[in-house]
Each structure stands twice: as C-alpha cells, then as structure tokens.
Amino acid sequence: MLITYLMFNCPIIFLTYKRPNETEKILKIILNLKPKNLYVFQDGKKKGFTREENQNHKDTKSIILKYKKNYSYKSIFYKENISQSLIGYKIIKEVFKNHEKTIILEDDCVPEVGFFRYCDLMLKKFKRNKDIAHISGCNLYYGSKKKKINDKDYFFSKYPQFMGWATWRDRWQKYYDPYLKNWEKERYEFLNNKNLKIGEKRFFTHYLKRFRQKKLITWDIQWVYACIFNNFKTVLPSVNLIKNIGYYNAPTGKGAKKFRNLVTKDIKFPLKHNPNITFSRKYDNFLYEGFYNRKNIFLRVINKIRYSPITKSIKKNLSN
C-alpha cells in the first residue's frame, strides 16, 4: 500500500533509457511522494538500434512526458547517447549544481516506499560525518538469505552498492574521478594497504586496468574504488529495499544471476539507530567472498569440476 506524503524535499534523480514498463512503474512510486525536486533523465539512442529498441526508447519518453501533465518535475532528454562511463557522472554533476545531496535510482531498480525516507534520514543524520560517503538501499545479504545482520535498522560496510543509493555533493565532487587519472599515483599505496585483502587488490587492479584500457565501460567502479581507497563507510538498511528487475528484460548492463529474485522488505519507522559506526565484518566478508575474491571464485569452479560425477567416473576408469 502506498503512503501519501505532503511533500518530499530531498532531490531525486531517476535515470531512464528504454524500459517503458519499468519506467512507468518506478515513476508512479516516486510521484506518490510528491517530490519537490525530481530530475528524470533519459539517455539518447545508440547508433544501430533495432526497430524494437527505437520504439521502447520512444515509449519511455512518452511516459515521462505523460505524467508531467499532472506533476511537476524536470525532464532532461539527451539527443545523443552518452558513454556508460560518463552518464552517471554527468547527471549527478548536473543536479549538484543546485543541491548538496541527492537520491539516485535507475530504471531497473524498484524501491520499497520506505527507501526514500530512509535515505533522507541518513543523509541528514550523517551530513557532517565525513567518514561516511554513500547510502545504499540494497542489502544483498538480506535479499539472498532473508536474515538481518543485527538488531539495528542500519549498519555500515566498506562496499558501496548502486541499486538505489544516495550521497552528498561535497564527497562526490572531492573524490569521484570519472577518468581515474590518479590511479597510477595511488596504485602503490593501494596495493600496500594492510587493511585490504589480496582478493580486493587483485579485483581492483584487474578492473581498473581494463577501465583505463577502455575495455570496461562503466561509471560506478570509480566511486567504489574511491570509497575503498579513502576508507569511507557505506550505510546499509537491515532489510533489502530494492528489487532489481533489469536482469529479466534486456538489461542495460551485464547482469548477475545472484541479483535475481532478491527478497525485499520495507523498513519500519522510527528507526533503531546504530551507535556502532564500524564496518560490519559479517557483511563485508559475505560480499568479499561473493564478489571481490576472484581467486576464490576460480577455485570454486576448479573444485566443482574436480569433484563432479563425470570427473570421478573418469578417475575411476583410469585407475582400473
């Protein structure tokens, strides 16, 4: 059931592309808040679009314009396609010209209603705590295990996540580097950081190298690196407030099976505040083993092959 708000003051960015059904679903949720400052962006078409893609892009724009008849928000339509390595940077930079904080949603992330209030409260509470740079609405641990990390309504991680999130202008403008110009200078310090595990160092060395070689097109890994390099904390809700639906219908980016079918649950207010502003070892170990420990993933594949029934059968035949 949707809750009606008098006015939601925190700025919201909604990035769309060519998902008309998803765009309409999420836009309705946002508009129910009566947002005072909503910015709806649509990236331009790529060259070589199919007829279906062209129609989906056109339909998405029509939906954005349709709701403007009854609601007030700013819509920005780019005529040309912006590189995936710059789109996030460009739209956030645009909004930060006039605001000191923002909530960001993409068109494949369906939020629970409480997501917006949660982000707004966290943005206000930790505004002056410069050790915290990112607020996430996605909790992959709860989404996959249906369990909470602790008895509080939020906790802290070293890993920022982007399926519904928020941040402040001062952190973003100071630390986000869309081109990773300082990577070569910072590389030695990063690799010698005793607080980082070998898997994290291997992961970022691999993917930042690919990004610098223009073999990886993205705008978010730069912020993940900035947060980890500067030892920033991310606030996460005790439950998962975001369902990613983009992995089912022609996703913009490459999906992962583990993102599918994540359980969501709305958060209750007032929040039980967490006085312990330290990294959650349990959550960070969960993400490390699932995403950042590339060697561990490789070994799991090897072990799966090694102990498969086919492999056992071959070994048995060879020994006879």
At which residue positions do the language-model features occur?
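An acidic/histidine-cluster motif and surrounding catalytic segment
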Residues: 5-104, 109-320
